[in-house]
UniProtKB/Swiss-Prot annotation:
Function (record text): This protein is involved in the repair of mismatches in DNA. It is possible that it carries out the mismatch recognition step. This protein has a weak ATPase activity.
Family: Belongs to the DNA mismatch repair MutS family.
Lineage: Bacteria, Pseudomonadati, Pseudomonadota, Gammaproteobacteria, Alteromonadales
GO molecular function, one term: mismatched DNA binding
HAMAP family associated with the record: MutS
Name the UniProt record assigns to this protein: DNA mismatch repair protein MutS
One Pfam entry name: MutS_II
Amino acid sequence: MNVIDTDDLEKHTPMMRQYLTMKAEHHDMLLFYRMGDFYELFYDDAKRASELLGISLTARGKSGGDPIPMAGLPYHAVEGYLAKLVQIGQSVAICEQIGDPATSKGPVERKVVRIVTPGTLTDEALLQERQDNLLAAVYQGKIGFGYATLDVSSGRFVIAELDTRESLEAELQRTNPVEILYSEDFGELGLLNGFKGKRRRPEWEFDYDTSIKLLLAQFGTKDLHGFGIADARLSLQAAGCLMQYVKDTQRTALPHINAITRFNQTDSIVLDAATRRNLELTQNLAGGRDNTLAAVLDNTATPMGSRILQRWIHQPLRDPKHIQARQQAVTELLDTAAHEGLHEQLKALGDIERIMARLALRTARPRDFARLRQALGLLPELQKSLSTLSAPHTTQLRQHLGEFPAEQALLERAIVDNPPMLIRDGGVIREGYNSELDEWRGLSEGASDYLVQLEAREKERTGINTLKVGYNRVHGYYIEVSRLQSSQVPLNYQRRQTLKNMERYITPELKEYEEKVLSSQGKALALEKQLWEQLFDLILPKLHELQAFARAAAELDVLSNFAERAETLGYTCPELSQDIGVQIEAGRHPVVERVSQTPFIANPVTLHNQRRMLIVTGPNMGGKSTYMRQVALITLMAHIGCFVPAGRALIGPIDRIFTRIGASDDLASGRSTFMVEMTETANILHNATASSLVLMDEIGRGTSTYDGLSLAWSAAEYLAQQVGAMTLFATHYFELTQLPELMAGVYNVHLDAIEHDDTIAFMHTVQEGAASKSYGLQVAALAGVPNKVIKAAKHKLQQLESRDHQAEGTRTPIQSLLALPEPVENPALTKLSSINPDNLTPKQALDLLYELKRLS
């Protein structure tokens, strides 16, 4: 029962009418309805919560004549349940009691005070600290797509104009949003498969004019020209929808979202979705984070540094000036060993980026202020450490760190050393910060001394030696006397509570003091909460500068991390060349060398204008895929400013990296392994350029031998002669090793292996020239294929090789075998290609249609 007909509300009890009205306003999310110490869920929400969270499904009487399914969870455990729900993409509206049950007539007044969705989280208990938490919106135009992402936990707002479906797929893979908003008529829902937290939004939320007004109001500007995004129509529509959604869910000002940037694909090396997946940059093929490039490179000191490192990995730079600026900073940190002390200093900063977002949203907790105080207190020491460094990029970052002595002093005066988790019960504001607060606290805290004095005085006055003065939250202050001595109490003692062996009393004097103390406690807490809110007002004027401090510290963390990784893992600084090419001496795979049980065999690669394609042959398990991937990873690492696992590396300009490595069925889209392989191949052949790095592994193996060989040959030929891309082309079709004899710039290399009797030893070394054989039977034996099968295979192999040898004299050269007949010219197509449809009148178009039918 998620959509309620208001005509039916009268059938229900007053409390259920209140619940159903609120549920109708939040029909697309679970409603946590506060009742005392529990959050209750009813009807379909209860059933879903029971299933998702493993909590009991019960019933709460009847309303409207029907039993009410119900599930509940204790309020103090809500954060753990919320974490489970947002991880699976479920949104939650939290409804609290805001009225006083003692004075309420009918149901206690309630209000939805918080909406929790996967993409709008800021609470550190719900966030993955070392991963971005992105909310995305996508809008489809007549041509192309608009894409926007926002990290509410940091304020980072980015848009992109994307021309093709493939570009959108790559962006989704790169940004990996946890929640996606899409319009009602979005036509590429297949791209969203596998993403959680998908939200279908009405078309009007993407209205262009409304979006512009929203963004101008948010940024406080008259236009968007200053952001360089005024012409990004589709992505601005996506950004507008996203902004409205965040406003609706956060229900507060969003001052930390103060800028928007445009992602331009021309600024970074383009990596399509298949390449990001195949290279296992931040996620392995099983969906985890172990044994990825990020896992090897990430020894950052802060969570915000880890997040920016992953963004760098997915956005390798093309501008050599920016790359060299990072390299110079890393080199200086390494040469001076400054990275060692810097790591410890940065580690103490914590996650200032997300703390500032919570401050902006006014959801920060006392310990956030304490961490900010600590970070600001460390700034002078950090500035001193950086003052000896002269690399331009480091100097620039140092300037952005800033100094905040007034804010640090304020927090030192205001917040106790070890504040509690919440402001709810007080104890956050330091003594001496506010004299009125100290006075009210003094009245409350002096109660224990007063009670001791009162107890001694009453014992002496009454002569009752069992008399005690105490307090509990239910009955307040009391004088306790044993039942045996209760007959001795004075007349002014009024019985308050009877226990098994005791009687409890109150006196007019004690009652008056109780009211005074309880009043002082309430006033102290109210004043402390007021002072707490004022702290936000005093810190937030420096919000933008503090955000800049966080960004600069995070980037320094990554650069320091690069220096440490270079030292620890034996990486060298790559050289950047203006000439196209990739030349690597003693290159290593950054991930495999860390997990391998045996020493990793380093290998070279040489690609340049006169040597643009390598045909890579060798046995299965010989290391072909590892070799190819390491070339791509070293190239990528060089373009993020990181040192690389190689003896030496000279890297030229790269515009794209493509990989066609491995494949599996795409059952969700109904595509076979071979179809996936051919789709990825087509993407490469259409989009690769002479400045691209292309890795092609086992093209054509998903179909018949001759079909596969023909496709592999033609793809290699096209890349070598038409595109001219730098290509590593691994294959088991030995016919392709003839390509170097037929085409300039194509060379053979192979992964070496040694055969001894029926066994094989993989040398994992790259040698010039083609492999002599594939060693398939030996690899099968190593895999545990039964001996009978291996023997039968050997016999069959001898028969086939003998037949091939007999036919050697009549064999057609491979290029002739693969040559296709020249296409016959089609007069209809010739006529069609000569026409400009924009110049045709309706009558001419109709006449042309009849003519084309005749020609065909």
